[in-house]
């Protein structure tokens, strides 16, 4: 029998939602509430394929959830509030405490709060959503799905930094990795598309959007990933630097008189594609500029692709080979150019890809871009974190 599950992503002043029919994984409706706690909050919901937008003051997340549930009934999306049997909440950081999704109790809520020091911008906001739903829908399971959980299978040699060991023991300083829900979804989907058990596959998953991370997935388990203690580490991103020499931070402070916080702000919000190009963090803008002859925009694209290319080689070495390379997220799904740059020269690894197939796969299309004879398969898979969240609600909420 079908069940309706809500997949939730709560920000400090926003609430993104999808109502999904399970186990069919059919989207019933989706929407966004913005400017919560501010004047003129915006509520957008999809009804019969059309976006319906209203502007009203919404004082907090509890009121936002209340308005959303009322809208479901008003638009005949549900008959009754009891039609919704579970909610799944994206939580950015689960630390070492949560190696998998978990049904939310008061104790779990408290532990998510304690982990806020590892994700001060996100965990408190995620908790606002959790508390609102637990208050208004007290009789159904609520499940926390952590961005970090999928990577908790990494071995020590992958997650430890070469710092004095007590920093790890005392402060939890280690690589955690992010985008776990996306990497988990696309790796499972790749196995389905190949009609092979995931246990038999070595997958390199490239989640490339404004934020980007690469994961080495061996037998369905993450054994390494490019992001680190925070989502700042790894490859070049839209506005984030990715990996740099740590000694640059005091050097920049000394040269510019900036504080550590100001330098961190630069690394997070003024670097990456934006910093390199000097014009934009949006890959589409940079591609146009590069075509019109802007050398810095071309250089930014080259650096961006080069870092991803390097991780693919590194992770192939970590897994003693690779069977599948997956591209997903906004850029991975839609940029023919970046995929081509990333794959260039990988023939030595057994990667043979078809430029025509590559050009045809964008705007939500799924498929292989390798030649049939290629030992390594290359696949574009639109990510669907909400479906993964809904699956985990079914599993960990005891609804199967």
UniProtKB/Swiss-Prot annotation:
Catalytic activity entry: acetate + ATP = acetyl phosphate + ADP
Active site residues of this protein: 147
Chain sites annotated for binding substrate: 90
Subcellular localization: Cytoplasm
GO BP terms in the entry: acetate metabolic process; acetyl-CoA biosynthetic process
Keyword Magnesium: yes
Database matches in SUPFAM superfamilies: Actin-like ATPase domain (SSF53067)
Cofactor(s) listed: Mg(2+); Mn(2+)
Metabolic or biological pathway: Metabolic intermediate biosynthesis; acetyl-CoA biosynthesis; acetyl-CoA from acetate: step 1/2
Record keyword Kinase present: yes
Site residues by UniProt (Transition state stabilizer): 179, 240
EC number: 2.7.2.1
Residues where ATP binds: 16, 207-211, 282-284, 330-334
Subunit structure: Homodimer.
Function, in words: Catalyzes the formation of acetyl phosphate from acetate and ATP. Can also catalyze the reverse reaction.
Family assignment from sequence similarity: Belongs to the acetokinase family.
Protein name according to UniProt: Acetate kinase
